[in-house]
């Protein structure tokens, strides 16, 4: 059973977050291992396994990029385990330039202002690529969507690096 079906949701990218959370809580109550404490070991293990599957499914469907990767896996694109090499050299060069720019920001006198501007640009790029990905998933352009998800992975990592630098500049690190 796929994760969408497990939660009683249609297999499509947009997910009602509050409905997902509500169904998650219902399933957690239904399959919580404590409810099976007095049952035979086999049933306890099955409940434990089901609870783990529910947790994994919820984390996957809750996170936009993981949800897209999961949808693609349902259509034969296993991005989590692939050894695919990014062939879009223009995109890769852009990523290298962005990382160099991020590295240089730390040494600037107005680093926080520069970082805020840089972060806003990255967020806008993520927003645009996410909109493209949603369009591709909705129109079942799986190969194109897989390529966009691969690019969003790079951008997601870049966003994390922006957050780490922000914490460092603010003295939280």
UniProtKB/Swiss-Prot annotation:
GO cellular component: iron-sulfur cluster transfer complex
Superkingdom field: Bacteria
Keyword annotations: Chaperone
InterPro entries linked: DnaJ_domain (IPR001623), HscB (IPR004640), HscB_C_sf (IPR036386), HscB_oligo_C (IPR009073), J_dom_sf (IPR036869)
Domain J residue range list: 2-74
Molecular function GO labels: ATPase activator activity; protein-folding chaperone binding
Subunit comment: Interacts with HscA and stimulates its ATPase activity. Interacts with IscU.
Family matches, as NCBIfam families: hscB, PRK05014.1
Name of the protein in its database record: Co-chaperone protein HscB
Organism in which the protein naturally occurs: Serratia proteamaculans (strain 568)
Gene encoding the protein: hscB
